[in-house]
Amino acid sequence: MKKTSLVLSLCLLLSGCGAQTQLSNDGKVASCINIETDQSKNIGTKLKCLDGKSSVLLESIKGPTLINIWGSWCAPCRQELPLLRSAYRSGKVKIIGIDVDEPNTQSGKDFAIKAGITWPNLEDPSGKTKSAFGMGVPVTWFLNSDGVVTYKHIGIFSSSAQLETEIKKYL
């Protein structure tokens, strides 16, 4: 009986740790070091990583990946976050966020940490990407394996089924 209780307790403890780890960002903004880029591209829009340690040329990002444009002040962006977190945790899709129009970098960092955003994020404090992405947020771009935009989803994803369908169709 004691052995069964011990095994059951251990299983519950381990399953709880796994779930928490998947949502945790350890109180830090995710690094951009693993964003894959095409080094032959050197002209375009350079954005700093939200962690402040590097920058990425937007036009050099390789796919397949989702580029999700968001702002901490954007209620619809917050609404779709659980769907994006679930898709990212599944390991079936890479996501890169672009935080736009924040009053300051710290606002974006604080939001990313509090919201459990564990994928890399770039920042666009001046809104210079609006000409490429459009005026509103959220907007999600789908880049195929060649880094070519295959689809632009404007607005929030209404369900995980919708997001999964678009991932399968456009990546």
Regions found by a protein language model. Give the residues of each.
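Structural microenvironment flanking redox-active thiols in thiol-disulfide oxidoreductases
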Residues: R78-A115, P125-S131
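A short beta-strand-turn-helix
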Residues: G44-T65
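Hydrophobic beta-strand anchors of alpha/beta hydrolase catalytic cores
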Residues: L66-I67, I95, T140
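N-terminal targeting signals for export/organelle localization
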Residues: M1-K48, Q162-T165, L171
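Loop/turn elements at helix/coil->beta-strand transitions in domains of secreted/extracellular proteins
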Residues: G63-P64, K92-K94, T118-W119
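Thiol/disulfide oxidoreductase modules built on the thioredoxin-like
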Residues: I113-I117, E123-L171
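Short pre-active-site segment immediately N-terminal to redox-active cysteine/selenocysteine motifs
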Residues: G63-T65, W70-W73, G136
